[in-house]
Amino acid sequence: MAVPKRKMSRSNTRHRRSQWKAAVPTLVSCERCQEPKLQHIACPSCGTYNKRQVLEV
């Protein structure tokens, strides 16, 4: 197994880890109630998905 030959500096460690972050979820507005919702998921406020009522709210 590979072993580091030298200690990695705090700056280099943080610089490498700066790219390792969570992506912000994309929000779209609901076609029926105009509330923000996640893509490809039923609207939590009105219960519609793809112009159909799928949840009882």
Curated annotation (Swiss-Prot):
Keyword Ribonucleoprotein: yes
SUPFAM superfamilies (alphabetical): Zn-binding ribosomal proteins
One GO cellular component, as annotated: large ribosomal subunit
Gene Ontology biological process terms in this record: translation
Gene Ontology molecular function: structural constituent of ribosome
Keywords assigned: Ribonucleoprotein, Ribosomal protein
HAMAP family, per database record: Ribosomal_bL32 (MF_00340)
Protein family membership: Belongs to the bacterial ribosomal protein bL32 family.
Protein name: Large ribosomal subunit protein bL32
